[in-house]
């Protein structure tokens, strides 16, 4: 493992990287938020179904 080479590679990537524009950031935030809400809603539906069915779940 060549540490100086690895560090130079990381520095080169960080120099090429740029911060996203406000529009890009908002779009990514909305998509990530929608995904989190979708997963939460699916989990809630599973919990509700398991709670309503007799003999299934705790």
Swiss-Prot record:
GO terms for molecular function: protein transmembrane transporter activity. One of its GO terms (cellular component) is plasma membrane. SUPFAM superfamilies: Preprotein translocase SecE subunit. It is found in: Cell membrane. GO terms for biological process: intracellular protein transmembrane transport; protein secretion; protein targeting. Gene3D superfamilies: Preprotein translocase SecE subunit. Keywords: Cell membrane, Membrane, Protein transport, Translocation, Transmembrane, Transmembrane helix, Transport. InterPro entries: Prot_translocase_SecE_dom_sf, Translocase_Sec61-g, Translocase_SecE/Sec61-g. The keyword Glycoprotein does not apply. The chain crosses the membrane at residues 36-56. NCBIfam families: PRK09400.1-6, secE_euk_arch. Belongs to the SecE/SEC61-gamma family. Component of the Sec protein translocase complex. Heterotrimer consisting of SecY (alpha), SecG (beta) and SecE (gamma) subunits. The heterotrimers can form oligomers, although 1 heterotrimer is thought to be able to translocate proteins. Interacts with the ribosome. May interact with SecDF, and other proteins may be involved. Essential subunit of the Sec protein translocation channel SecYEG. Clamps together the 2 halves of SecY. May contact the channel plug during translocation. This is Protein translocase subunit SecE. The lineage of its organism: Archaea, Methanobacteriati, Methanobacteriota, Stenosarchaea group, Halobacteria. The gene is secE.
